Regions:
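Contiguous N-terminal and early-domain "leader" segments and peripheral loops that mark the onset or edge
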Residues: 27-47, 115-150, 277-294
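Extended, solvent-exposed, turn-rich assembly/linker loops in the middle of proteins
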Residues: 149-225
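Sequence/fold signature of self-assembling virion shell proteins
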Residues: 213-336
Length: 336
């Protein structure tokens, strides 16, 4: 009897798992596009922000030269987390299971496979959050891995959208003017800025300024509201609104490197200024595996059993690339 799960069953399981919370990915890259080829194709089209020319009603309309469109393709590296279904665990009571055990070994096996799939999903989404952070910080993403040549995908964000405050303008200095900085960034972005995302160091510097405190002092009588209390342990925290629609968030998301060191997605004293106008999507190349049926999908889970020695495996494959349609709608600033 074949005890392997078919693709559709595993896809249904992984799709029904409780979602793993991402922040940057969810905020700036909400869309999903799946490709039926292993390569991702995308057009780099610069939005034409020129004014329509005024002409006399008696003069023929003026033809405006179409901006060029560049087709590029990229074959992303596979993410392939893989785990063994430990046969010893099927005989051990699971957390929350009644003393004496109410689950059969087969039921525990199913639960273990679901746990593994949930972990795979988290690991893949955490990698994509890291890719989203790179794109927002630099306008580029570096893709590298075992047996995969290091490649840099450049989305051609304007160099001026990656900034570093210097000298007396740094928020660590008493001479800085953070609200003036925010106004300047808003003028520089391709689209209106509606969100400021700060790491905790940048936010701590931001709220200590008198000009910011004046807004805080008048927050009950104005539309400027900022929460100055400590975070409650969440990886992201809404701090309030400046003016009518500029949301302020603190983000403390992180991952661990191979040495188990904690690495924040946003370096210390970083601010991301942007909005939904980034219009990012999560693109997925097809997984070239006959078991997947050569279908377009975000994640392809599979399991199989080697007979000698008898070992059961669960693996999830994905070939993702976050793509910002409008990279100049976001800026990254080192403020101290």
């Amino acid at each position: 009897m074949d005890r392997n799960y078919d693709t559709d069953t595993l896809v249904e399981v992984i799709g029904g798992l409780e979602p793993f919370e991402t922040f940057l990915l969810s905020l700036f890259f909400p869309g999903v596009i799946t490709f039926e080829t292993s390569s991702i194709s995308f057009d780099k089209v610069s939005e034409d922000m020129r004014l329509a020319p005024f002409v006399s009603p008696l003069v023929a309309g003026k033809v405006m030269k179409q901006l060029g469109s560049e087709m590029r393709t990229f074959k992303p590296a596979y993410l392939k987390p893989k785990d063994v279904v430990d046969p010893e665990r099927v005989f051990v009571r699971r957390p929350g299971e009644q003393i004496g055990g109410t689950l059969s070994p087969e039921q525990r096996r199913n639960a273990i496979i679901a746990d593994i799939l949930a972990d795979h999903r988290k690991r893949i989404l955490r990698r994509m959050e890291h890719m989203a952070a790179q794109i927002l910080l630099t306008g580029k993403v570096v893709v590298e891995g075992e047996d995969y040549p290091t490649q840099e995908v450049d989305f051609y964000r304007s160099p001026g959208n990656t900034l570093a405050l210097t000298g007396a303008t740094r928020w660590s200095e008493s001479t800085a003017k953070p609200l003036d900085d925010v106004e300047s960034w808003a003028a520089q972005a391709e689209a209106p800025i509606t969100t400021l995302i700060m790491d905790r160091h940048a936010y701590r510097n931001f709220v200590r300024f008198e000009e910011v405190q004046k807004l805080l002092d008048g927050r009950r009588n104005s539309r400027s509201e900022l929460e100055t209390g400590p975070d409650t342990g969440r990886l992201y925290s809404y701090k309030g609104t400046l003016g009518s629609d500029l949301e302020v968030w603190v983000y403390s998301g992180y991952y661990r490197d191979e040495a188990k060191q904690k690495i924040p997605f946003l370096p210390p004293n970083t601010v991301i200024a942007g909005s939904a106008a980034v219009d990012g999507v999560r693109a997925y190349g097809a997984i070239i595996d006959s078991s997947a049926g050569y279908r377009a999908m975000e994640m392809f889970p599979k399991n199989w059993i080697n007979q000698d020695p008898a070992v059961e495996y669960v693996m999830t494959q994905s070939a993702p690339l976050p793509i910002p349609r409008h990279p100049d709608a976001a800026l990254a600033i080192t403020v101290a």
